[in-house]
């Protein structure tokens, strides 16, 4: 049985109860982890209120604002972790964004600003958060991010996000190579399409889900909690020999030729 008792885990990217990050947070909590949750701050406090109410049953010991495009907020987040916890064991990176206009139509029409924004939030944030977490993972650790098949195959309308996920998976390998000597493992979970706030921006997402339900060996898509189970496994000592990998949790869709 998975046991994360005594482990400190920071979970990023929870927006609502359909977020994959929410499924991961629930399973880490069920395994006994001590949770810290970040939220995206906004002027009206909309996300803070919504996420705070959602995660309250998990009793997180830290609840922090963190916009990954704001270097000061990132530093403040990890300073607080150091001061309150002293150590970080698990980092969950569930952050992705691209402008809606760049997730439909022709990829060649992606704007320069849209391309930069997608890679900054979806890819570089993993590098930056991992760098901030590194000195706090004094007893080793596990860093886990979320990818998608569109990072290795051309998926209609996924466009610039596919490029961002390809960069994310490469970043996993480079971070795993760098951090392995400190017993810090870095892995990605490539989940099948799930209806989330982020995926709703992708043109034709419902068609993608229906296609997976028809073609995947299990004849269904996966749930947030199934992804959460995999994350809890990767965060645990049961996965102590796994790093630099992309694990597909997609009902088997990735293996199909057509």
UniProtKB/Swiss-Prot annotation:
GO BP term (any one): fatty acid elongation
Quote the record's binding site residues for NAD(+).
13, 19-20, 67-68, 95, 165, 194-198
The entry marks the following residues as binding substrate, namely 98
Instruction: Please give the InterPro entries that the UniProt record associates with this protein.
Output: Enoyl-ACP_Rdtase_NADH, NAD(P)-bd_dom_sf, SDR_fam
Alphabetically ordered keywords of this record: Fatty acid biosynthesis, Fatty acid metabolism, Lipid biosynthesis, Lipid metabolism, NAD, Oxidoreductase
> Which residues are responsible for catalysis?
148 (proton acceptor), 158 (proton acceptor)
State the gene name recorded for this protein: fabI
Function comment: Catalyzes the reduction of a carbon-carbon double bond in an enoyl moiety that is covalently linked to an acyl carrier protein (ACP). Involved in the elongation cycle of fatty acid which are used in the lipid metabolism.
- Lipid metabolism: is it a keyword of this entry? yes
Q: One GO molecular function term? A: enoyl-[acyl-carrier-protein] reductase (NADH) activity
Q: What is its EC number?
A: 1.3.1.9
What pathway is this protein a component of? Lipid metabolism; fatty acid biosynthesis
What protein am I looking at?
Enoyl-[acyl-carrier-protein] reductase [NADH] FabI
Give the quaternary structure: Homotetramer.
> Per the UniProt entry, what species is this protein from, by scientific name?
Nostoc sp. (strain PCC 7120 / SAG 25.82 / UTEX 2576)
Question: Which family does the record assign?
Answer: Belongs to the short-chain dehydrogenases/reductases (SDR) family. FabI subfamily.
Q: Cross-referenced NCBIfam families, in alphabetical order?
A: PRK07370.1
What is catalyzed by this enzyme? a 2,3-saturated acyl-[ACP] + NAD(+) = a (2E)-enoyl-[ACP] + NADH + H(+)
